């Protein structure tokens, strides 16, 4: 499996490395149900996660079909529901 | 390997522990939500909740008008064991933030 994931920025090579590298970064978490969760602003980030993909995030916004549905002060998401975790590039925030 | 590594990396479950004996909001599968006091939980997110209000949301589509009718049903339960595999999300109760 060498070579897989080398497109990813810099040092991450395995999923485990990715999970170590994203703590404290802004992410988008998409669930199996299609709902996705983002930090409410670029400074709002993933607090921590574990090997089961359980996730803790601050100031999370919930989007269903692209529409903002809910906001949470802190959110713990059970890992089995997670479809993916994606990092977000820190560019100028597009107006929401 | 890398320079700094905390001796005890905090897991999401450690942070849920901070909510013990506090009221929390739980989102479950099947469009259900719970609000109650967290008495206990485990790594599966099995939980014991007290003084719980459950909200079930259903969306009906009218055959003729195709309008969506959103209904919520609520019930209160004094003491509840929640099986962890149904849990999607846990959060402190939604507050009116400043």
UniProtKB/Swiss-Prot annotation, chain B:
Domain Sm, chain residue ranges per copy: 11-96
Cross-referenced InterPro entries: Lsm3, LSM_dom_sf, Sm, Sm-like_LSM3, Sm_dom_euk/arc
Pfam families noted in UniProt: LSM
Source superkingdom: Eukaryota
UniProt tissue specificity: Expressed in roots, leaves, stems, flowers and siliques.
Gene Ontology MF term list: RNA binding
N-acetylserine PTM positions: 2
Disulfide pattern: none
Function: Component of LSM protein complexes, which are involved in RNA processing. Component of the cytoplasmic LSM1-LSM7 complex which is involved in mRNA degradation by promoting decapping and leading to accurate 5'-3' mRNA decay. The cytoplasmic LSM1-LSM7 complex regulates developmental gene expression by the decapping of specific development-related transcripts. Component of the nuclear LSM2-LSM8 complex which is involved splicing nuclear mRNAs.
Family (UniProt): Belongs to the snRNP Sm proteins family.
Name this protein carries in UniProt: Sm-like protein LSM3B
